[in-house]
Amino acid sequence: MSETFDVNAAIYPFPARPVPLDVDQKAFYREKIKTLLKQRDAVLVAHYYTDPEIQALAEETGGCVADSLEMARFGNNHPASTLLVAGVRFMGETAKILNPEKQVLMPTLNAECSLDLGCPADEFAAFCDSHPDRTVVVYANTSAAVKARADWVVTSSIAVELIEHLDSLGEKIIWAPDRHLGNYVQKRSGADVLCWKGACIVHDEFKTQALAQMKALHPDAAVLVHPESPQAVVDMADAVGSTSQLIMAAKTLPQKKLIVATDRGIFYKMQQACPDKELFEAPTAGEGATCRSCAHCPWMAMNGLKAIAEGLEQGGVMHEIHVDEQLRQQALIPLNRMLDFANELKLQTKGNA
């Protein structure tokens, strides 16, 4: 598999974590959010990687906790006129693409994603133009502009099936932006894949040596790995899958101990799914390195209670997602192709973002 545009050396401008709230402040903002949701005819949709208290509030108020695509689909089916998306910016954009008639708010518009940042639309378009014979498949973790340039959008839960399908048609693929997931689907499918060289700052930090040491401490534990992780880490897994697939694996695997290599935000729903099991965070860094994300996306951490309340209360340019209508229509085409493909396979599309 060929690769290009190595962004390993990129120094992303990590945001400051929200100032911790005390018990009284948390209670105040929870009640304020509940009131504002009713006043604005809004529903709170949160990603699996947000902090547990945010996921709990989404459930308590009739919202949902899911991956980025399911968040958008939930918003489409929910009667609320406003969606408050607790996640990162591309998730808000996806919600707006699929729900143009609704107001989409976010706690902050500065919640980025290293995969999105590592795939600038102009550079990616030029790269695609230089390989006109290839079908362009992009991961959901991309901007609206990158989606608009693609032939297909895909989530990790159906990535292998889609690439196998395209390969059976004799098509050669451009895959973007995650090189580890691209490598995973190429190995599984055997397709001709030209891969953009992006990476998730969280999953890229999992290391085999540290994981092997933890496995030695817990030899009876199963290892669950998201395919955005390096191939050597994936090779150590008992189960590989998207966020939703890892939660399902946690329920169905016989082991009572689970070592989980993905963002630790997933532990909230995973522990709900299997309360009788013991969960361990897979180690990040190791092998002489220090962790930067330390198994939690710094941009997901921006979705605090105070920020959610401010997003609902203030709206406007600081919190509302807008997508150019022409761009939205272009991005909707590959998104709908993915949804149609998933329906034909009789799969419920649940990816990672």
From Swiss-Prot:
GO terms for molecular function: 4 iron, 4 sulfur cluster binding; metal ion binding; quinolinate synthetase A activity. Iminosuccinate binds at residues 47, 68, 139-141, 156, 226-228, 243. It is found in: Cytoplasm. It is an enzyme of class 2 (transferase). Binds 1 [4Fe-4S] cluster per subunit. GO terms for cellular component: cytosol. Belongs to the quinolinate synthase family. Type 1 subfamily. NCBIfam families: nadA, PRK09375.1-1, PRK09375.1-2. This is Quinolinate synthase. It comes from Yersinia enterocolitica serotype O:8 / biotype 1B (strain NCTC 13174 / 8081). The lineage of its organism: Bacteria, Pseudomonadati, Pseudomonadota, Gammaproteobacteria, Enterobacterales. The gene is nadA.
